[in-house]
């Protein structure tokens, strides 16, 4: 009888080990993580051009050590095969193998990055698959600021570009930036905001690893969706963020803002001091952080300036895009030049410090633009752009339809 019981116990132990082996030995995620971070990289263009997404994911894996995530979880959703499918994966530290590993949590065989419902469900799935007390989101792809979607990228493209329009035509032989590509799979920023706001949970922050996304029109539309937004007012080189450096900061226990502040510095440090290690081999990187709770107050200050404007030389205004149509101009510099009331300018600058902390504003001496293959000097930097001063009649009309413009005029 005792021998029989012993055999049964041994059999149960063997079955238990067999079950564990089917469930990935070394993969033991917490039932409720302290934080889940989702890196969402829609589109194929950056992968086809230079395996930039694969390099980013590899970089995340290098950051995931036995201590970096703590009680957190790191998810990656991307499209390795084609533009109509996607995978939700988790990069975790396998204590048995003593290295990071990747496991696929969910596959999407019918995915469209331009479908708001699909993107909304993807965000919901991240929380279902990796429930946590707090959440962070990184979107890495192509970006074109506030320009309404119609055949470009997530989150913005161009509505009806004329064939001879220079605005989104990159120069022959230009280096890869995260600006143009994957036409036909895009979201409007208002659609992205809605997909975020409808969730039963809230992302603390959104990091845009995309070009031109630190523009006030976009940030204002997202002010109710997340608490903090990290982005660049100009083009981001194809390499994007140094994920091996920023991921550990995103899981630190010193507060969300502290981790994001360090992430901003790491981005700048890569392109200021270690740019020779990048594929782009370009010393070009500008970054900032927006405190979305301060943007309504900033809009109020801006509204008080509309009746105090004066003529100014637009050629003296700091811009963030190459070629003829600059489109993106430094917001604070614009107010400084166009407002005739020094007190109003000072009030605006004071609110800018609340909305865009100086500790998170970093820039190289110049930025590279794929639209003319040139480097352009940064002589004034507040970290955020505005398109209101653009002299092009076409973009003036479109910009006046943005929520930022309507709420400040």
Give the label of every model feature segment.
Residues 11-13, 235:
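Long, well-ordered alpha/beta core segments of mature domains
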Residues 16-19:
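C-terminal motif of bacterial Sec signal peptides marking the signal peptidase cleavage site
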Residues 30, 163-409:
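Terminal, contiguous helix-loop blocks that mediate binding/assembly
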Residues 36-41, 73-77, 136-139, 204-208, ...:
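Structural recognition of the beta-strand scaffold that forms the well-ordered cores
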Residues 46-51, 84-86, 145-149, 213-218, ...:
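Extracytoplasmic/secreted cell-surface and envelope-processing proteins
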Residues 79-82, 90-99, 111-198, 210-211, ...:
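Catalytic-core segments of thiol-dependent peptidases
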């Amino acid at each position: 009888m005792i021998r029989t019981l012993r055999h049964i116990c041994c059999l149960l132990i063997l079955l238990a080990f067999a079950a564990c082996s089917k469930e990935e030995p070394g993969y033991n995620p917490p039932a409720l993580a302290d934080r889940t971070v989702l890196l969402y990289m829609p589109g194929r263009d950056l992968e086809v051009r230079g395996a930039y997404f694969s390099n980013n994911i590899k970089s995340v894996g290098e950051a995931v050590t036995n201590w970096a995530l703590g009680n957190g979880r790191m998810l990656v959703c991307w499209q390795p095969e084609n533009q109509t499918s996607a995978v939700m994966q988790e990069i975790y530290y396998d204590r048995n193998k003593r290295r990071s590993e990747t496991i696929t949590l969910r596959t999407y065989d019918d995915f469209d990055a331009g479908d708001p419902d699909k993107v909304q469900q993807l965000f919901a799935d991240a929380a279902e698959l990796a429930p946590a007390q707090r959440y962070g989101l990184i979107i890495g792809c192509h970006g074109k600021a506030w320009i309404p979607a119609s055949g470009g990228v997530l989150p913005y493209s161009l509505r009806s570009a004329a064939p001879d329009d220079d605005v989104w035509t990159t120069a022959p032989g230009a280096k890869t930036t995260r600006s143009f590509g994957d036409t036909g799979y895009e979201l409007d920023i208002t659609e992205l905001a809605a997909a975020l706001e409808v969730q039963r949970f809230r992302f603390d922050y959104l990091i845009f690893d995309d070009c031109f996304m630190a523009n006030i029109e976009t940030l204002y539309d997202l002010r109710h969706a997340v608490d903090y937004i990290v982005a660049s007012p100009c083009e981001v080189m194809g390499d994007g963020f140094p994920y091996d450096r920023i991921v550990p900061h995103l899981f630190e226990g010193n507060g969300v803002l502290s981790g994001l502040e360090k992430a901003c510095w790491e981005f700048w440090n890569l392109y200021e001091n270690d740019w020779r290690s990048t594929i782009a081999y370009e010393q070009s990187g500008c970054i900032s952080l927006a405190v979305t709770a301060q943007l309504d107050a900033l809009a109020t200050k801006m509204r008080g300036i509309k009746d105090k404007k004066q003529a100014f030389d637009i050629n003296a205004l700091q811009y963030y895009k190459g070629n003829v149509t600059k489109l993106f101009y430094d917001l604070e510099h614009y107010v400084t030049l166009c407002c005739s009331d020094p007190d109003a300018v000072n009030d605006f600058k004071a609110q800018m410090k609340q909305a865009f902390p100086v500790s998170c504003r970093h820039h190289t001496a110049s930025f590279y633009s794929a639209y003319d293959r040139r480097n352009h000097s940064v002589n004034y930097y507040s970290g955020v752009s505005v398109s209101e001063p653009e002299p092009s009649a076409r973009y003036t009309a479109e910009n006046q339809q943005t929520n930022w413009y309507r709420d400040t005029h």
